[in-house]
């Protein structure tokens, strides 16, 4: 099943907070954008924020083959008993089109946050009982324990804010079969100062979160790299920026490290709810043309 999943999602997808909007006035805009992404050749859309099957359904209905996944659905805010029927409804209407991406979120964002690994295991037990099959769920796994869980109890991992070096480490733990689909921020800016400023603006909400900073420290970065918005070394490792050649080189580094698929998040300085459709087209011309 995992081989088929890799073929279904292809090499490239789009990661977007904007595409999960619940604003009824934007439904037409979102449907049109999803249809265009499918036409451009992207294999998947990954819905950022605390997303759910309800967010995925309109995009699936607006397209014919695009895979839509949550990235992520917080285990603290969605009960397995509810996720099961939601998955079953989508699967019945659109077989094979929805992937349930799960994560433990962060202590600063969840009041009841405690023993996240044990809570994730219990959540997976609940999904088993609710009929959500392991081969249709993915984990936003960063550390070794959660990566092993993604290998053993899911179809793979959808890590966020990682480097090619983390990707190689993740592949070693996962083995060959599971899907490894990291998110990668893409900054279409050739001026180094401007590109890094955009990256640091984006990183501002993540550097206070231990899940990410601990992962950076595990993979060779220092406390100095995490200060003042992130060092050039950290920024350049985490983001693809520059001209087409530079962006393609960073993307290739992830694939060489063992990624099967990349969830590309365009960062252009606009609000995260915006839909950077021109940038998506430009990326498609480089990667899929």
Predicted feature locations:
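Active-site-adjacent structural elements that line small-molecule/cofactor binding pockets in enzymes
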Residues: 1-289
